[in-house]
Amino acid sequence: MVNFGLNSASILGIFLAVAGAGLYFLRSVRPEVSRDYDIFFSAVGLLCGLILLFQGWRLDPILQFGQLLLSGSTVFFAAETIRLRGITTEQARRSAPYADDRRVSKTRVYTEAELDQLEPEDEPVARNNRRLRGYDDDARSGRPDGYGEAEARPRPRSQGRNAPPTNPNPRPTRSRPSAGRSAPQRPGPAPGYNDNYGYEDDYSGWESGANDVWDDPTPSRRPPTRRPRPEAGNDPAPSRRPRPSNNPPNDSFGDRPERNAPRNARPYEDEPPAAYVDYQPIDEADLTPRPTTPEDPADRNQEQSRSGNPRSQRPSRSPVDGEEPPIGADDQERFDY
């Protein structure tokens, strides 16, 4: 049964219902001081006000007085909380570097998402390294840093051609035995290499005062392959070496005449000269095209005798004393009957 009467409890109920509705609409009037949990307290105030409005006549005067004190205290703390919110918002606006004066719609509620500021992940740095992976592994394995700097560093140019370049890595060489007389030195393979493309070093022959032959400014080249020289017994004619000229060659890089000497200074006399062949003129009849008719046996024999081995037509030469006759040569005396 609903008994609506105008008493103190009913008046208190109307006040609580109006306060709850006002707390709800505070979000639209002053959104800077409103909070999300105000909706809950506005619903509680509206419900309590309706109960007192319709059922307040059942309460005793002492109970109505208790409801009045409780409602007054609640309204006081609600007003004080809203005032403190306004003060805090004003201080935050003054201390902020910029003022947010955006217009807020009365029909829609705008809430900004509060996102945590995350630190960016460390991305691997892309290294533009042109060296191979094997070189990087060698560098990490403990190889000294200055190992490859001598090769990568460009060689500075000398001011003049007479100034020999400096060698960053000097190496000792083998000492050369001194001969009784100065013999001409023919160009040969660089020391440290043999004709079999093998590398051999005589560590016992290194001396501190030996001349350094590795400081030649010209790039080192592999010596060309030389044919084995015939032995003294099998050599038909002794080979003669060219005599060195009295004027020493112009060597601007050091006193080493064998460095600038040409490689082919000694004539190639390893093989015996070819045998002399008499000059035989060519007939014009041989140059004319021959008919394709079948040949006669007589013409064939004549052609074979004409185009025979020129060695058989040349005069025989008596061998010199101590010289063997050439192999494969026909002995004319065997055919003379």
Swiss-Prot record:
Region (Disordered) residue spans: 111-337
Pfam families per the UniProt record, alphabetical: Ycf66_N
Acidic residues composition bias: residue spans: 113-123
Bias type Polar residues, positions: 304-316
Segments of skewed composition (Basic and acidic residues): 133-143, 253-269
InterPro entries associated with the record: Uncharacterised_Ycf66 (IPR010004)
Domain of life (superkingdom): Bacteria
Record-annotated membrane-spanning stretches: none
Record family assignment: Belongs to the ycf66 family.
Protein name: Ycf66-like protein
Lineage, opening ranks: Bacteria, Bacillati, Cyanobacteriota, Cyanophyceae, Synechococcales
